Amino acid sequence: MIETDILIIGAGPTGLFTVFEAGLLKLKCHIIDGLPQPGGQLTELYPKKPIFDIPGYPSVLAGDLITNLIEQIKQFQPGFTLNETAETIEKLEDGTFIVTSNKGTKHHANSIAIAGGLGSFEPRKPILKDIEFYENDKGVEYFVKDPEKFRDKKVVISGGGDSALDWSIYLSNIASEVTLVHRRNEFRGALDSVEKVQELKSAGKIKLITPGEVVGFKGSEKIESVDIQVNTTLTTVPCDYFIPLFGLTPKLGAIANWGLEIEKNAIKVNNALDYQTNIEGIYAIGDVNTYPGKLKLILCGFHEATLMVQSVYQRINPGKKYVLKYTTVSGIDGFDGTRKEAEKQVVKSIE
């Protein structure tokens, strides 16, 4: 039986940062994740994608952010149960929990922090004849894990959201040709991304086909071209890769059966205080939760994690007041015996 103060379900950025904030309060954490490595979507789906809204980083690659978070929490020695998913939960008489994974690993924790992002996820695939044939290195890619794979290649991207816009912009400097196809003239993405695509189109760096829709493929062993329906005209565009980016289908999995209050595939929480669910001792933070005014941003997940661990501290130490100290003043004592602190000022008289 694995013993811990906080059992975190999900090893994405929010789950990882929870370890740091909990460590400042001397709370131990253990993380369960269904993937074989920490990082969640950032590692599994787009490690090379730049993120622009992390404070202090004008730009940071998703994979690098995870690497930095893992380095940041190393001193607090979190445990990991990877390649396993949380399956069942039992609340004991003392208010603590036993969570058993799909492989039978048991975890005993005072509190549970569900930080599972979108839960388990799979891409929304377009309904096209023979698309399965072209999967598995034959030309159809649902994620961009390694942009270098597309260097000097002809790429057709289909979609109208942020991912389609962002990857069209990014790959325009790598691929020999980028064609962006969307069934509408209007895009549902960040305004600056839409304007950037317009700018790249004017510069001849991106071919834009709207309104248009990919309706078929050609190629005996791998994709050689895609057929695009534009109004009543069928156009054939040569390509090496077709990347349909229509979002992800989220699934909460077994967590949906834990008696939590669910709204539109997200877990309802009390955002007025501590992001606790309808079950005392179970919290939900990051993209997996919902409340009025919710924003699905990594930054917001960090904030939610910070407040959540304060609540867990009070739950474990009822009536004990925690005095907030700035890390620049107090320093950080790791569970591994290390200490980090600011350089001491030297007091010296001037004669």
From Swiss-Prot:
<feature type="binding site">
    <location>
        <position position="14"/>
    </location>
    <ligand>
        <name>FAD</name>
    </ligand>
</feature>
<protein>
    <recommendedName>
        <fullName>Ferredoxin--NADP reductase</fullName>
        <ecNumber>1.18.1.2</ecNumber>
    </recommendedName>
</protein>
<feature type="binding site">
    <location>
        <position position="121"/>
    </location>
    <ligand>
        <name>FAD</name>
    </ligand>
</feature>
<keyword id="KW-0560">Oxidoreductase</keyword>
<keyword id="KW-0521">NADP</keyword>
<dbReference type="InterPro" id="IPR050097">
    <property type="entry name" value="Ferredoxin-NADP_redctase_2"/>
</dbReference>
<dbReference type="InterPro" id="IPR023753">
    <property type="entry name" value="FAD/NAD-binding_dom"/>
</dbReference>
<feature type="binding site">
    <location>
        <position position="86"/>
    </location>
    <ligand>
        <name>FAD</name>
    </ligand>
</feature>
<comment type="similarity">
    <text>Belongs to the ferredoxin--NADP reductase type 2 family.</text>
</comment>
<feature type="binding site">
    <location>
        <position position="328"/>
    </location>
    <ligand>
        <name>FAD</name>
    </ligand>
</feature>
<feature type="binding site">
    <location>
        <position position="33"/>
    </location>
    <ligand>
        <name>FAD</name>
    </ligand>
</feature>
<feature type="binding site">
    <location>
        <position position="46"/>
    </location>
    <ligand>
        <name>FAD</name>
    </ligand>
</feature>
<comment type="subunit">
    <text>Homodimer.</text>
</comment>
<feature type="binding site">
    <location>
        <position position="287"/>
    </location>
    <ligand>
        <name>FAD</name>
    </ligand>
</feature>
<dbReference type="Pfam" id="PF07992">
    <property type="entry name" value="Pyr_redox_2"/>
</dbReference>
<dbReference type="GO" id="GO:0050660">
    <property type="term" value="F:flavin adenine dinucleotide binding"/>
</dbReference>
<keyword id="KW-0274">FAD</keyword>
<feature type="binding site">
    <location>
        <position position="41"/>
    </location>
    <ligand>
        <name>FAD</name>
    </ligand>
</feature>
<keyword id="KW-0285">Flavoprotein</keyword>
<dbReference type="InterPro" id="IPR022890">
    <property type="entry name" value="Fd--NADP_Rdtase_type_2"/>
</dbReference>
<dbReference type="GO" id="GO:0050661">
    <property type="term" value="F:NADP binding"/>
</dbReference>
<dbReference type="GO" id="GO:0004324">
    <property type="term" value="F:ferredoxin-NADP+ reductase activity"/>
</dbReference>
<dbReference type="InterPro" id="IPR036188">
    <property type="entry name" value="FAD/NAD-bd_sf"/>
</dbReference>
